Each structure stands twice: as structure tokens, then as C-alpha cells.
């Protein structure tokens, strides 16, 4: 286990960035992360090794040794996917470090950690917002490099997500997000229900927290100045095809199933639970009659 909690009781650390890593041995921007860590001792970098099959863990351990005061490594024994890596990393940092804000960032640094820090500092000016999320809005003065060939699919998905959330967010899928510390247990205690759209699921959980009509008063979008799509960070076509079904699944889980839930918390569509309850009722009736 390469977990270091020596700084959990210091007052130097203010922010925590979780960085999920899977097979990043040859891709991790090592020098960029190290430069940022050494320049910003107030920021904790927690790298989550998501059961990598290469030497990612050794690379991360080496990075930690170069800046042990604000770099830690959380090793997952097996690959659980980005959503689970982020979830476990967020809970680990929440439980072991006293920070003001926690969030995550992609290992490829499509969004630079310096801009993540700008988001965090901007968030402190608006304490009424529970979360601040990066938004890759193409506009004058911004350097946002996205694959134009994916724009049609992305726009269709974005419209579907807007319908699901019933809110006019510009970008739910950006890998840079930051949350107030008190929201972490509510957002990350339970595993995510979909592997591809956990960002959307975070918004749905925020919606549960703030309410459908007041979600936009609890979440702040931050237009990024720089964002660059990096190599194979793009969603594969076969995964893109699965997204509509994943959205339907989330719609059912978060919006529909609640309307068909019993007082004991079971869904009316849970056949196995319904059979169990029926058998229990029959036994009780038989005991009463005989």
C-alpha cells in the first residue's frame, strides 16, 4: 500500500485533486504534475492507480517521493473503471485530509491543474454554490481544441442530458469538477450505476441535494480558457453507441423508480423481492388461520 497520510493533520493543504490513472506508465505527464505540486504546496494531488497492468504504480510512487508533502498514491487492487477510481479517491481524501475543496482531473491534463486551481479559488468567492464544474465552451479568447468530427454526436448527447437534468448546462462531461467538502459523502458514498456517464450521475445526485428547480443555484459553471483533447482519451465509437441506453437507465433509476418504491425502500418492479414478500404474507396468513 503506497498511501501517505502524514499531512492529514497539517494546515498547509487547502485543496485536493483526485487523478484516476490506468496504464499511464508511458503517458503520464510526470514533469507537469511535479512542477505543479512543487509550485503549489497548498494543493494535494492524490493519484488513484486503477489496477493498472503496466508499471503505472511504480511511476506514481516515484512521483510521490519527489514531493511527499502534497502527493499521495491510492492503489486499487483491481481495475474498477474511472468512475470507481474517482469515487474511492474522493472518499479516501475526504476521510484522511482536512481540506476546503475536493475535486478531480483527468490524468492526460486536457485541463491543466493550474486552471483547476483557478476554478477552486473562484469557487471560494461564491460559497453559496456547492460545486463548480469546468465548461469547454468555444468562444473568442479561449483555446478549446475539440474533435469536430464528434461534434454532432456530442450535441445530440448534450441535448439528451439537458432533457434528463431539466437544466441548461453547457457541459456535463468535462473532467474538471470541484465540490465543497460537506457534499462528498452524499455524492460519492454509493457506487455509480453506469460506467460511462458518472459525470451525469453526479449532476443527478446534486439535483437530489439541491432540488430540480434550484440545481442551477447550487452548481456554478466555469468557462475554461484552455482545453485540448488528448490522444485516446476520446470515447470509443462502441461506447458512444451505449450512451442512449445508459441515459435511459439513469432516468429510470433517479426519476422513475422512486415513484414505484414501497415504504420499505423496495421497487415494485423488483420481482424477487415481491415474491419474497408474497411468501412471507402467505406464511403469516397460514399461522393466523391454523
Task: Map each language-model feature to its residues.
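Hydrophobic helical membrane-anchoring modules
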Residues: 1-15, 190-290
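Short beta-strand/loop segment that forms part of the nucleotide-sugar
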Residues: 19, 42-52, 74-76
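Short, well-formed alpha-helical segments that are part of the catalytic scaffolds
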Residues: 23-38
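Acidic helix N-cap motif at the loop->helix transition within catalytic regions
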Residues: 26-30, 54-63
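A conserved acidic beta->alpha catalytic loop
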Residues: 49-58, 109
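Acceptor/aglycone-binding surface of glycosyltransferases and processive sugar-polymer synthases
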Residues: 76-92, 101, 113-192, 196, ...
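Short beta-strand-to-loop acidic/aromatic patch adjacent to the donor-nucleotide binding site
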Residues: 98-110
